């Protein structure tokens, strides 16, 4: 039987992996978006673990809202990436410092 601490440790490990992914890879926007999504999933795992441990459904309902926002964020982020790649032929963060007006 897995206890609450097992889920919290797994959530902390996933969160730490995503933070390391953000700090180590600041060049590629797709990898940055994937690291942010992994961070949100780690937070969702903690919400579900606490919700199950406390016997309350509020945490699980909150996870559905977070997943909805994460899906919208991914769709908008990928749409922005497609537009940037069409215009600039790159998705590296260093090359996105110029603004058109």
Curated annotation (Swiss-Prot):
One of its GO terms (molecular function) is NADH:ubiquinone reductase (non-electrogenic) activity. It is a multi-pass membrane protein. It is an enzyme of class 7 (translocase). Signal peptide: none annotated. Its EC number is 7.1.1.-. GO terms for cellular component: NADH dehydrogenase complex; plasma membrane. Its main location: membrane. It is found in: Cell inner membrane. InterPro entries: NADH_UbQ_OxRdtase_chain4L/K, NUOK/Mnh_C1-like. The chain crosses the membrane at residues 4-24, 30-50, 61-81. GO terms for biological process: ATP synthesis coupled electron transport. It catalyses: a quinone + NADH + 5 H(+)(in) = a quinol + NAD(+) + 4 H(+)(out). Keywords: Cell inner membrane, Cell membrane, Membrane, NAD, Quinone, Translocase, Transmembrane, Transmembrane helix, Transport, Ubiquinone. It comes from the Bacteria. Belongs to the complex I subunit 4L family. NCBIfam families: PRK05715.1-2 (NF004320), PRK05715.1-3 (NF004321), PRK05715.1-5 (NF004323). NDH-1 shuttles electrons from NADH, via FMN and iron-sulfur (Fe-S) centers, to quinones in the respiratory chain. The immediate electron acceptor for the enzyme in this species is believed to be ubiquinone. Couples the redox reaction to proton translocation (for every two electrons transferred, four hydrogen ions are translocated across the cytoplasmic membrane), and thus conserves the redox energy in a proton gradient. NDH-1 is composed of 14 different subunits. Subunits NuoA, H, J, K, L, M, N constitute the membrane sector of the complex. This is NADH-quinone oxidoreductase subunit K. It comes from Aromatoleum aromaticum (strain DSM 19018 / LMG 30748 / EbN1). The gene is nuoK.
